[in-house]
Amino acid sequence: MARPLRAPLRRSFSDHIRDSTARALDVIWKNTRDRRLAEIEAKEACDWLRAAGFPQYAQLYEDLLFPIDISSVKREHDFLDRDAIEALCRRLNTLNKCAVMKLEISPHRKRSEDSDEDEPCAISGKWTFQRDSKRWSRLEEFDVFSPKQDPIPGSPDAVHLKSAPSHENMQTDLSDRQEVASVHSTGSLTTHAPQRGEAAPARTNSVLSVCSSGTFVGNDDSFCSLPSPKELSSFSFSMKGHEKAAKSKTHSLLKRMESLKLKGSHHSKHKAPSKLGLIISGPILQEGVDEEKLKQLNCVEISALNGNHINVPMVRKRSISSSTQTSSSSSQSETSSNVSTPSPVTRTRSLSACNKRGGMYLEGFDPFNQSTFNNVMEQNCKNRESYPEDTVFYIPEDHKPGTFPKALSNGSFSPSGNNSSVNWRTGSFHGPGHISLRRENSSPKELKRRNSSSSVSSRLSIYDNVPGSILYSSSGDLADLENEDIFPELDDILYHVKGMQRIVNQWSEKFSDEGDSDSALDSVSPCPSSPKQIHLDVDNDRATPSDLDSTGNSLNEPEEPSDIPERRDSGVGASLTRSNRHRLRWHSFQSSHRPSLNSVSLQINCQSVAQMNLLQKYSLLKLTALLEKYTPSNKHGFSWAVPKFMKRIKVPDYKDRNVFGVPLTVNVQRTGQPLPQSIQQAMRYLRNHCLDQVGLFRKSGVKSRIQALRQMNESTIDCVNYEGQSAYDVADMLKQYFRDLPEPLMTNKLSETFLQIYQYVPKDQRLQAIKAAIMLLPDENREVLQTLLYFLSDVTAAVKENQMTPTNLAVCLAPSLFHLNTLKRENSSPRVMQRKQSLGKPDQKDLNENLAATQGLAHMIAECKKLFQVPEEMSRCRNSYTEQELKPLTLEALGRLCNDDSADYQHFLQDCVDSLFKEVKEKFKGWVSYSTSEQAELSYKKVSEGPPLRLWRATIEVPATPEEILKRLLKEQHLWDVDLLDSKVIEILDSQTEIYQYVQNSMAPHPARDYVVLRTWRTNLPKGACALLLTSVDHDRAPVVGVRVNVLLARYLIEPCGSGKSKLTYMCRADLRGHMPEWYTKSFGHLCAAEVVKIRDSFSHQNTETKDTKSR
């Protein structure tokens, strides 16, 4: 008998339980870790999507509407390049993966009430933000000129609806499924069409959207009529697609849908009802349509047109009309902004090509209209006849032989006749009918306005390379460009004599008695050069005077006078913004770096706040795409985000510091400019007198003298006299200023990014990468960087004398600008620093970073003119970018803002007065107090309409009566506005209303700020109060002198409070151009408070002088 087999030896039950429990815990821990990491990635991906201009996808994920179809996202952003698309899709794929894992993140919330980071801004123009519901909704559009072949009518493909991005997205809102339908034509760009009977709503709103090509919902006239029933037969309305798709889902998916339903019902409680309603577009062209339908659709038979015409898809017919409006942009969006001038502005260029309004704008140009070409040809013929080729040119009597004349005349012009005047030194001509921009208290020596009309014989050329002559005559008047033209033949003349430009400029500077005046009101040419100024510009393939090297302008200018009025305040803290502050006038620096006409609209300092917001998001997208493509995997991740400027951290007290160690933001809040005046004067001294010093910024100065200069800057911040100082001492002091800043000029957050660009990004990609990184800098850092780079480019222009190339300068200045040693000490542990010190030599990483900093600064100095321009790629997203350029309205357009059709601008002004007193009656309810170092009360109020700008209010007590304060505001602006360059009343509308233009100075080389406002005042108010109201307006008689500012709202309310004192309340909401929304949040309120303080101090200073006079 065989023995039975023995069972194998088994472990004890306790060991088995222990091992299985350990394995289960490992699995649970791994799943928990993976889930936590996925949640972190999802949160950072949503933050990046909002910062890079894709907030709609972050909203969809938070609403549990993921996963989405990546291919539809690519089609929606077809204007982006491949790298940017990959960066976007990488985040969306991460969210799709997290959605499959059923991960949820908390809804996005602001960190604080001071932050305006949630301002809606999307790169794509196919999404719109509903301000009432705080939701993003998609504007579904057709492409009538689809490259795909249309299906045969009646075929199954002809009635298919657009497929949903995913099956889960089909069940967006079960409670509202009976109201959602999306109707598309056969010409829609749809690549993933579902089978017949499947419905795919792509919107979360309960609306029926049928959009036509190239239009936005509610912005086009094509939506005013409904299609006929026969036309509607080509569309399929399927309301039960949700139910059919839901039946095919598994049990788990049904549970998910139930959670969506609960979430949707939860959101509906906080969600405002949609106001879009039923919107149906015009009929969509399809195959087999008859002649009757074509007439009904107002279609144009393209095949019957002339062969010379160009078939351009999505071109809407617009009438070509001439206008005298000025514009800061060289092109306009096809979709006009709601607040822009109602009629399309079309400007044509004549053969002269030199007139101020002679730019060629193709907006509204209809390529299918043959009469357009006939009109243009006829106008060209008239231009040729008006400028005969045998025109005789005259030169002035005091012309110096061997130099090019600064003024030329033709015909029978006589310099001493026709009641005209010629400024031979500046090249400007004041003919009959000249309008001058002159302050109210102008001297009688200035020219009077003439009433006769100008003729062709009075036309002269105005040169942009003559220092000191902007649009002003020798008497300080502003030229009337609308009544003056420039000879077209001068283009050809300049083409042959462009080599003599430098000689002319040096000669003019030598004999010029104008120089840089410290007072704009006493200056012959008070307004600095601006990119909007008209100047002589030759053809695109020729060199322009503004594009010449900076050495083409004279660098020798007289020093600022040192006789500064004695200060009567402490000179620190809030007293830093007193009305007797001295401001630097640096005209030659501004004129030498003035952009050419064809690049004016691309300058960053000309963009509106909404455009800057969109440009910053696009820059983050571009920078992320480049760094993720070229840097190592451990050098990037989801940590890319826009720098957060409103962190809740304890801000150090800088009351005991004035210059060194003070952040740039504090300088802006104190003085309105990011660089202290004494530092600007040091740069001017080096530029005017020390560029010939060999080894400038390389040779060291004397420490004792440098310390004395530092103390001089701290004690006298308004005006430091550097006369007789050593160039090397001043240069070393300038390096120490940037070294002592609390953070590097490129900021702590972005300094490493700048270094990575020059370590990993290829050379041909570095320019666009560095431009994107610069756009992520705070405004004050970017402005100072631009000023410094332009200054250093002037230093390198004199390389033959000082032997300082861009690389040599970079070696000397890179450690101070990047704070390389400081960053290493802060980012390294004490053990690592001790090991490096013991070795006695830097490691390879430090060497690479130093080399990258040197190469980067040298590259930025050489390419400084290209770094501060809008990228050309922004033109691809034209509809979403150009429509953000909010321009001032005309008087007629202001009247149309009222609900009454017969209203004019007077009704608009009366509404403004009523709204002001409504605020006073409600005691400014809803305003939030804001701390400031100024001796004034500051508060703000958020406004939902218009650009992302707050309404600020500053209140102070002034020792004067309301009538005196109103007079000071209207007639004596130069007594309290230290930045004022010139002012002029353009037109008097009535006894209390006028069009007023004034120009304010900016930190060189940035252009001046040009204001054209409609202002009205009231004196017969209750309790003896007075009010002054201002709003920017577009006026054809106001020439553009600088960057045109858009004042949305400005109000002065003056209330008596007894004892000869008054309470001044100033409210302002303005777009100064070239600033991000964060700048207005951080700094603009302080500037408003500083303004009322300067108004008060103008009376205090006057009373003090009166008492001193009486005591004598």
From Swiss-Prot:
Biased composition (Basic and acidic residues): 437-446, 534-544
One Gene Ontology cellular component annotation held by this UniProt entry: membrane raft
Disulfide bonds: none
Topology class, membrane: Peripheral membrane protein
Stretches for region Focal adhesion-targeting (FAT): 296-468
Signal sequence, renumbered to the chain: none
Spans annotated as Disordered: 146-203, 318-350, 405-459, 512-574
Subcellular location: Cytoplasm; Cell junction, Focal adhesion; Membrane
Pfam families reported in the protein's UniProt record: RhoGAP, SAM_2, START
Keyword terms, alphabetized: Cell junction, Cytoplasm, GTPase activation, Membrane, Phosphoprotein, Tumor suppressor
Predominant localisation class: cytoplasm
Subunit structure of this chain's protein: Interacts with EF1A1, facilitates EF1A1 distribution to the membrane periphery and ruffles upon growth factor stimulation and suppresses cell migration. Interacts with tensin TNS1 (via N-terminus); the interaction is decreased by phosphorylation of TNS1. Interacts with TNS3 and PTEN; in resting cells, interacts with TNS3 (via C2 tensin-type domain) but, following growth factor stimulation, TNS3 and PTEN are phosphorylated which leads to weakened interaction with TNS3 and enhanced interaction with PTEN.
Record's comment describing the protein's domains: The SAM domain mediates interaction with EF1A1, and functions as an autoinhibitory regulator of RhoGAP Activity.
UniProt protein name: Rho GTPase-activating protein 7
